[in-house]
């Protein structure tokens, strides 16, 4: 992989900048962490060299000063909202985040339930956390939020919210996903702190858009593609341009809400410490790009992947035409085409040649391998075996799993487990491969190559079953699929 981002420089520069911001506010700073605090795979894809846990590692350098508050919306609890990248609900992710933070030596002070209006599911979640010894606080729905600043910044507004008791100079506000109420949490806390005579401050840590890259830079366009469902739009920060005469990039929600935030700061603090949304940020990522062309190309590839994801969502009923059209426009702005993703034409050509669903994968050395549908294997399972053989230097004509070993598994699926699809999925072929590895050197060599699949690109000529999608995700393979089902059915399950 070509490197475009200096991760070590980023860790050092980012932690130093946050320390400076803490010092500007009398040693008490509420830091809103946008995006993912760890598992930031989007950043690692568009900034090659950025580690998915970079922000967490940076925070660990501040561990003696920091405590974490995890925010979750009562509405998201009520709707059982799911993290698309992990396939778990937001409330389960709160517990996962707590485990991850504490296992790294970071202090999690409490959980804050926002947008609370008596939801029974939120009450049950609160009780569940309290039984685990976790402190839980609530932020209530405020009428007229966010425009009625006089009411919001009063004892009847923020004053009704619980006050989170914190003990450290840096309070990191994070959440399972966007729209959880992180900024509202920070402002509510500032209100309570000033009531108590503590002159705390607020800052925002948002990796994207990168404020000191051009508006239409592919890295920033890739962020728009990633948030197409939220209808976020990158724009020039007009407040920063007016205050300093300098062009910087922010996104529409922060720009639109800034006059309101500014008014709230003035009511809470007496004056607003910031002249623009850009001023509120502490992100140093743009200063750590060491090869701009590498990051541009990685971002163009990300937009293509997001396009396929939006098309799949549209076909399955969970996406919208607007989302697809927006990403099509972003592809044009980034001067990218779907055929720039090498595995796309390879998979489609294989489908045409075999007259059945097919798949292709680009290996770390750039070589493309393909898989086709057969009586024994689905295209994805065949692709996986072919990729492992290629990585291990095994002749493609050699069976690493005997067909005689596959037939009993097919019989188990169809005769005893009620499946109508006899072909093996990825997880099933991996189990068969691991069993064969006990007696076959070739199978063992193939199995040992599994870690080398991480980061590989794959494309299939049809949409896959959930079981194969999840398997690719677990293997770390970046998957895209054509937006069509293998067979036209009202109810798709294989």
Language model segments and positions:
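Active-site pocket-lining segment
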Residues: 399-419
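A short, polar/charged loop-to-alpha-helix boundary motif
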Residues: 376-392
């Amino acid at each position: 992989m070509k490197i475009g981002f200096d991760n070590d420089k980023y860790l050092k520069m980012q932690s130093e900048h946050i320390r400076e911001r803490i010092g500007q506010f009398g040693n008490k700073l509420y830091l809103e962490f946008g995006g993912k605090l760890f598992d930031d795979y989007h950043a690692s894809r568009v900034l090659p060299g950025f580690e998915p846990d970079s922000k967490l590692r940076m925070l660990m350098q501040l561990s003696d000063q920091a405590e974490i508050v995890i925010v979750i919306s009562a509405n998201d609890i009520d709707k059982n909202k799911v993290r698309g990248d992990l396939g778990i609900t937001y409330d389960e992710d709160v517990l996962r985040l707590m485990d991850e933070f504490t296992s790294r030596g970071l202090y999690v002070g409490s959980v804050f339930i926002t947008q609370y209006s008596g939801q029974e599911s939120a009450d049950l979640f609160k009780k569940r956390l309290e039984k685990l010894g976790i402190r839980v606080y609530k932020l209530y729905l405020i009428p007229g939020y966010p425009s009625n600043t006089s009411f919001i910044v009063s004892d009847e507004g923020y004053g009704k919210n619980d006050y989170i008791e914190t003990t450290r100079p840096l309070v990191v506000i994070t959440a399972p996903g966007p729209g959880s109420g992180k900024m509202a949490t920070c402002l509510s806390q500032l209100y309570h702190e000033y009531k108590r005579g503590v002159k705390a401050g607020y800052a925002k840590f948002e990796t994207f858009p990168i404020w000191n890259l051009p508006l239409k830079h592919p890295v920033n366009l890739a962020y728009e593609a990633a948030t197409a469902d939220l209808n976020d739009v990158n724009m020039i920060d007009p407040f920063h341009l007016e205050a300093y005469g300098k062009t910087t990039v922010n996104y529409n929600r922060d720009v639109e809400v800034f006059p309101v935030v500014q008014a709230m700061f003035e009511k809470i603090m007496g004056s607003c410490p910031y002249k623009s949304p850009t001023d509120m940020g502490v992100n140093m990522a743009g200063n750590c790009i060491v090869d701009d062309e590498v990051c541009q190309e990685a971002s163009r590839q990300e937009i293509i992947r997001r396009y396929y994801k939006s098309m799949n969502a549209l076909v399955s009923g969970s996406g919208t035409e607007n989302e697809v059209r927006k990403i099509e426009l972003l592809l044009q702005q980034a001067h990218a085409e779907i055929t720039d993703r090498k595995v796309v034409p390879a998979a489609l050509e294989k489908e045409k040649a075999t007259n059945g669903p097919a798949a292709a994968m680009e290996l770390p050395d750039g070589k493309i391998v393909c898989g086709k549908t057969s009586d024994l294997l689905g295209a994805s399972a065949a692709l996986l075996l072919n990729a492992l053989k290629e990585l291990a230097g095994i002749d493609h004509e050699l069976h690493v799993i005997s067909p005689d070993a596959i037939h009993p598994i097919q019989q188990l699926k169809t005769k005893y487990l009620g499946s109508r699809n006899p072909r093996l999925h990825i997880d099933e072929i991996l189990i068969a491969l691991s069993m064969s590895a006990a007696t076959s050197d070739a199978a063992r060599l193939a199995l040992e190559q599994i870690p080398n699949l991480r980061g590989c690109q794959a494309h299939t000529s049809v949409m896959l079953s959930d079981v194969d999608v999840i398997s690719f995700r677990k293997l770390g393979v970046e998957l895209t699929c054509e937006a069509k089902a293998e067979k036209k059915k009202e109810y798709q399950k294989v």
